[in-house]
């Protein structure tokens, strides 16, 4: 991207763009687009085999729904002379059904062994936020009388993982996402202020912070420095695990929840159940992208190599 900045180009051709790592693709595209957007006859041509639900997928779906100005062209294998059902059968026998669907049927397939069923992920439709600013995407403005919950994950702000939180409307079932924050540069010292401001705007939302690593620092700042009252606590019950609430259910109480193997296993199971039974509606692109690469590794689920699972 640094080689392109400051240049002037009439046409930029991006080949197999879907195979560029997501973080690199987003940075590159944000650098490239301004170099050609000022001309009247300039063009961006993107050609690629589908490869999961990444930036190429987002550009394609936005074009299908007339949310951007790209013209899409889909070249199916059946349009190539000499390719018939016999060729299809032989190709699948020499490769695999999944590879054929991606390479020749032009299907956007996520990774294998994902937590959420791939067929369910494929039905998730994302929408553009009504307002975006400095990492915060808002899909719905606060409604009077509605109940909101903010769930936050804290990173160190070193460009690797993202500090993130999601605002859920839990007033009625199905639950829905009304706002999302995601930033890989925000420092833990400043993150509590952002959580505080957004939670306060959403009717003094209940806030649950993951307190592994430096998350405890953020939860402590919310409780004692910013004096935010609606912070969800967890009571430690030994082998019985952790019980979230106001911290009055017995046992040693802590601010937020600490993710252990047992907590993660239960959380993944519950998340899978409420999404696949349509009790939680997902309409955020970044979250859908993370679900498409959140896979089983050993006895637990985590992001595929080169991807993130902060949301």
Segment roles from a protein language model:
Residues 1-35:
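Conserved RecA-like ASCE ATPase "motif II neighborhood" in helicase/translocase motors
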Residues 3, 27, 79-154:
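ATPase catalytic-site recognition across NTP-hydrolyzing enzymes
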Residues 8, 49-115, 246-247, 253-254, ...:
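Conserved P-loop NTPase catalytic core
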Residues 19-22, 157, 214:
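Residues immediately C-terminal
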Residues 41-49:
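Structural recognition of the conserved hydrophobic beta-strand(s) that form the central parallel beta-sheet
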Residues 53, 171-298:
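Mg2+-dependent endonuclease catalytic cores in nucleic-acid-processing enzymes, primarily RNase H-like
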Residues 145, 158-164, 174:
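Short, flexible loop/turn motifs enriched in small residues
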Residues 299-311:
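Acidic, Mg2+-coordinating catalytic module of metal-dependent nucleases/exonucleases
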